[in-house]
Amino acid sequence: CRKGKGVHAGANRAQRWRRAIRQAHGPLFCLKADISKYFASIDHARLKAILRRHIHCDRTLRLLDAIIDSSPGRPGVGIPLGNLTSQLFANLYLNELDRYAKHDLGIRYYIRYMDDFVVLHHDKAQLQAWRARIEQFPWSALRLTTNSKTQIFPVGPDNGRALDFLGYRIYPTHRLLRKNSIKRIRYKLRRFKRAIAA
């Protein structure tokens, strides 16, 4: 686990930014998106090219190539869910999108966790312009598409909508677990209790 990263750090940052934008500008809008079938869509050749920009040891690259090529599914596409290397590869692959959003587009309030990301801003029109560019980039650079559920919506007390991200409904002063998250936890606890009782 990387220090200052992860679900809680992302939720803290989103909450802090939500407060800051609201105090500075009043209205707040959110662009929320995720990559469609992310792990199954990662292009092997592009992933290997990205790895070669960061790693220069031939033995290490041969080993990583073998891991990537051993992925089940369509030849040349997809990495298995759950592998530790897959998590590393997935983060490195979408680092290209992070750099594009932050450096090329100049987006300040951008947070990504694996294949889910949000962009916060006070101007809805600016978010719409960024959305068009962000939706083009993953396909042209990485052969990925954003999910059809991608949306821009107002956040705040005026419409009663919370910032829904990383399993939380995020408000300026507190966070609540999503109802689906609570249901999943209860279900797992019931299964665990049954397993212990058996």
Which ranges hold each PLM region?
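Active-site substrate-recognition loop segments, prototypically the cytochrome P450 B′-helix/B-C loop
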Residues: C1
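Non-catalytic nucleic-acid substrate-recognition regions in nucleic-acid-modifying enzymes
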Residues: G4
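Active-site and adjacent loop segments of nucleotide-processing enzymes
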Residues: D164-A198
